[in-house]
Amino acid sequence: LADIKIDNMHGVLGIHQLSDLSATLFTTFVVVVIINGFNLIDGVDGLAAGLGALSSFLFGLLTLFMGQFDIAIISFSLMGSLLAFLKYNFHPARIFMGDSGSLVVGMILSILAINSVKHGLVFEIISFPNKGPLLAIGFLAIPLFDSLRVFLVRIRNGKNPLYPGREHIHHALLDLGLGHKRTSGALYLLSFLL
């Protein structure tokens, strides 16, 4: 309907044009991974909202540079709503995002990521021209890589990767003695640097 799918990886990992079936399957996989990444990272007060706000800000800047002002409005609107929510979500949190919130944030960010892959910034003079795929991965690095790492650790240990556990990076930082605010702040900084 809206042609929201990744049909070309623009040379990243040597992948270019995808067939219609491959594009549909890969896009579905990407959407599920991003949605679950944000759901799984929502284990510390303020973390999912802050990372979502940062990601939506970066996607907003990207879409401004791409001249997609309507998508930029969506990105900055998500950022604004998450920043307003964040005021009440820091420890001790008065409201919680929950699954409903983290799944919606993940869904919106997955659409923004697909848009950046499909129409990303084009630099003709550098290796592969469209940097959209790499930018999307960079903007969502913490939830994506944390989920991947947790799934691999759980599988290696013979555990079901879909069951809850304390293998996430935010749990490791809490176990080191960082509180909720410092854990969230450290991961915000890491996400910004990536």
Describe the role of every protein-language-model region.
Residues 17, 29, 36, 161-169:
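Juxtamembrane loop-helix boundary motifs flanking transmembrane segments in multi-pass membrane proteins
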Residues 2-13, 117-120:
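Transmembrane alpha-helix boundary signature
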Residues 8-18, 178-179:
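Membrane interface segments of multi-pass transport proteins and intramembrane proteases
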Residues 2-5, 26-36, 52-58, 79:
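Membrane-embedded alpha-helical core segments of multi-pass
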Residues 48-194:
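Alpha-helical transmembrane segments
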Residues 14-28, 67-80:
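Structural signature of hydrophobic alpha-helical transmembrane segments
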Residues 36-39, 89:
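Asparagine-centered polar/low-complexity signal
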